[in-house]
Design a protein with these regions (language model features):
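Charged interaction scaffolds used for protein-protein
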Residues: 1-20, 26, 36-40, 47-183
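Short conserved micro-motifs at the rims of enzyme active sites and ligand-binding pockets
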Residues: 33
């Protein structure tokens, strides 16, 4: 997909059929918060996630949930699947909850966009603008420091300095709910 001349998608495809989905960035941040909510059992989450479908819920619920995940990740229908398996999930480098102020101020500073008053912004547009924020913004600085592997820094003083910054900007650990045998 080329965003310079193609519109952002408003639908997902489930078993060959197109379904309209919510596209506003606020709804997708809520989607992420729901997924991350340790208090909500996975079966209930899946049912709640189906509310992101506007014009009816697909019959194949599992595929429907995966289609929403693909939309969240901005996967296009003809995108090649990444075949590499790393064995672990990538490290979380930002949180829409914990970094909200930094994200908000970066959008105001760089793009002149007030995320509270803008009536609508497509999730993919939001993500594209977020990725394009300059490195000098606070959120990009936090992401950069959180991503540094201290083992790669040879200089002891520099490693100590970076470690101190990482402790300051670290994401707070959430208590993850343990899954039951039925999940």
């Amino acid at each position: 997909m080329n965003i310079l001349f193609e519109e952002f998608p408003k639908t997902v495809r489930v078993n060959g059929e197109r379904f309209l989905v919510e596209t506003d960035f606020r709804e997708w941040i809520r989607f992420i918060q729901l997924i991350d909510d340790a208090k909500v059992p996975w079966q209930i989450k899946c049912r709640l996630l189906l509310q992101w479908y506007i014009d009816g819920i697909p019959d194949d619920l599992e595929t429907a949930v995966y289609a929403l995940g693909d939309f969240l990740a901005m996967k296009t229908e003809n995108a090649e699947e990444d075949e590499s398996i790393t064995g672990s999930a990538p490290k979380q480098l930002y949180s829409f909850e914990q970094d909200a102020e930094c994200i908000y101020s970066a959008f105001r500073e760089v793009y002149g966009i007030n995320l509270q008053t803008i009536p609508y912004m497509h999730w993919w547009e939001f993500q594209t603008l977020f990725a394009g924020l300059p490195e000098k913004t606070e959120i990009k600085q936090r992401i950069m420091y959180r991503s540094i592997d201290l083992r790669t820094i040879k200089d002891k003083d520099e490693r100590k300095r970076i470690k101190k910054i990482q402790e300051i900007v670290a994401l707070k650990k959430k208590n993850r709910r343990k899954m039951t045998d039925y999940e």
